[in-house]
C-alpha cells in the first residue's frame, strides 16, 4: 500500500518560509539548504519548502493551488490559535466561521498558500 509521507510547497524564499513555519509550528526544521527546508512531525508526515528558483523546479502551473489543514480538538482551540496567529502578525484570509464541517479559519503563508485550521472529521 502507498502511504504519502511528504507534502511539498513551492516557495520563493525557503529560508523566510522556513522561519514562518518554525514560528507557526513551534519547532525547528530537520533539514535546511539554500533551496529547501524540511519539517518532520510525530505522525511521520513531513513538510518540504522547495524554492521555485531551483533549477530542479519545473512547472507549467500558475497560482496557489494548495492548502494545509491543521486539525485541532475543538472550537475553543480554533479560536485561541486564530488569536495567537493574528497577534503574531500572520495574515488571516478568512476569520473564524462555522462551515458545514465545523468551526474553521484560514491563514496565509508568505507565498499565499492557505493554512486551514479545523476540527477533526466526524
Regions found by a protein language model. Give the residues of each.
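Conserved active-site tyrosine of GNAT-family acetyltransferases
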Residues: 17-22, 85, 112
Amino acid at each position: 500500500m502507498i502511504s504519502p509521507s511528504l507534502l511539498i510547497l513551492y516557495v520563493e524564499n525557503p529560508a523566510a518560509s522556513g522561519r514562518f513555519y518554525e514560528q507557526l509550528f513551534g519547532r525547528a526544521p530537520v533539514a535546511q539548504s539554500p533551496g529547501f527546508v524540511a519539517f518532520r512531525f510525530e505522525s511521520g508526515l513531513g513538510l518540504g519548502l522547495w524554492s521555485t528558483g531551483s533549477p530542479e523546479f519545473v512547472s507549467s502551473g500558475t497560482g496557489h493551488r494548495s492548502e494545509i489543514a491543521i486539525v485541532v480538538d475543538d472550537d475553543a482551540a480554533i479560536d485561541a490559535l486564530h488569536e495567537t496567529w493574528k497577534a503574531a502578525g500572520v495574515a488571516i484570509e478568512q476569520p473564524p466561521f462555522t462551515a458545514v464541517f465545523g468551526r474553521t479559519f484560514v491563514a496565509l503563508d508568505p507565498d499565499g498558500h492557505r493554512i486551514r485550521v479545523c476540527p477533526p472529521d466526524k
